[in-house]
């Protein structure tokens, strides 16, 4: 069994990597991927904590997080596809410009 500190440290590292990618990247597709990494890091923390205390609640929350991530990914990819068809780019700087 993996110790609690190791699992939570791995989850924290994954979360920080996802957050860093979300802040640094300018492509919306990569930002969506980084958001998925952050959701998976939080789900990993739930599983590790549930395993440490011997409760199945962490695994239930993991299933809920995976369901949420799948819904978020499908809606996000559909929106990105429509955005790419209209603007021919996924760069956040060009997308955020408002028409006046």
From Swiss-Prot:
GO-annotated molecular function: NADH:ubiquinone reductase (non-electrogenic) activity; quinone binding
Give the Enzyme Commission number. 7.1.1.-
Major localisation: membrane
One Gene Ontology term from the biological process aspect of the record: ATP synthesis coupled electron transport
Entry GO terms, CC:
NADH dehydrogenase complex; plasma membrane
Keyword Zinc-finger listed? The answer is no
The listed locations are: Cell inner membrane
**Catalytic activity, reaction form:** a quinone + NADH + 5 H(+)(in) = a quinol + NAD(+) + 4 H(+)(out)
Record key words, sorted: Cell inner membrane, Cell membrane, Membrane, NAD, Quinone, Translocase, Transmembrane, Transmembrane helix, Transport, Ubiquinone
Membrane-crossing segments per the record:
4-24, 28-48, 60-80
Stated role: NDH-1 shuttles electrons from NADH, via FMN and iron-sulfur (Fe-S) centers, to quinones in the respiratory chain. The immediate electron acceptor for the enzyme in this species is believed to be ubiquinone. Couples the redox reaction to proton translocation (for every two electrons transferred, four hydrogen ions are translocated across the cytoplasmic membrane), and thus conserves the redox energy in a proton gradient.
Q: What do we know about how this protein assembles, alone or with others?
A: NDH-1 is composed of 13 different subunits. Subunits NuoA, H, J, K, L, M, N constitute the membrane sector of the complex.
What is the name attached to this protein's record? NADH-quinone oxidoreductase subunit K
Q: What organism is the protein native to?
A: Dickeya chrysanthemi (strain Ech1591)
């Amino acid at each position: 069994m993996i110790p609690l500190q190791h699992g939570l440290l791995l989850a924290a590292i994954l979360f920080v990597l996802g957050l860093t990618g979300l802040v640094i990247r300018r492509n919306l597709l990569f930002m969506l991927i980084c958001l998925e990494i952050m959701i998976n890091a939080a789900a990993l923390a739930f599983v590790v904590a549930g395993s440490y205390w011997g409760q199945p609640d962490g695994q239930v929350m993991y299933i809920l997080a995976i369901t949420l991530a799948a819904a978020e990914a499908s809606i996000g990819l559909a929106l990105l596809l429509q955005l790419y068809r209209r603007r021919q780019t996924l760069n956040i700087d060009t997308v955020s410009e408002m028409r006046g």
